[in-house]
Amino acid sequence: MNPTLAGKTKLVDWIARLAAAAIMGQTLFFKFSAAPEAVALFEKLGVEPWGRLATGGFELLAVVLLLVNRTASLGGLLTLGLMGGAVMSHLTVLGIEVEGDGGALFVMAIVTLVAGAITTWLHRAELPIVGARLETQA
């Protein structure tokens, strides 16, 4: 973990990381078990089954990276990419509300995107290649 994180910042960091990991983690069962809801969603996107399984694999990797202090920056970055794709899918193909969920999937994607952004920002100095430059500009 970034040694400069202290007090409330460290708490915000852990809340963001745990929230993102919990939200992505709870969807893994549905993706890997081919739950009808997940299959229907990825069929609508035109990427069933490979898109569902690849997304599940990358989300599992993001969860692990988020929960390990040394890799939190990469987990946050991967979360940003995954949830950016999820939000764009909702805005362009799926719609805000999917199968009568009242927009719950969309809201969870937004919350996870924000949590990933917070994590990435707080751990920006640890990002490979660009981290040192980002830290000096902040």
Question: Over which residues does each language-model region extend?
Answer:
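Core segments of alpha-helical transmembrane spans in multipass integral membrane proteins
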Residues: Q26, V47-V64, L80-G81
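Membrane-helix exit/interface motif
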Residues: F30, P36-E37, L53, A62-L65, ...
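Glutamate identity and glutamate-enriched acidic tracts
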Residues: E37, E43, E48, E59, ...
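Solvent-exposed, well-ordered loop and adjacent helix/strand elements within mature globular domains
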Residues: A22, Q26-L53
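Extended, low-polarity transmembrane helix blocks
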Residues: M1-T27, R70-A138
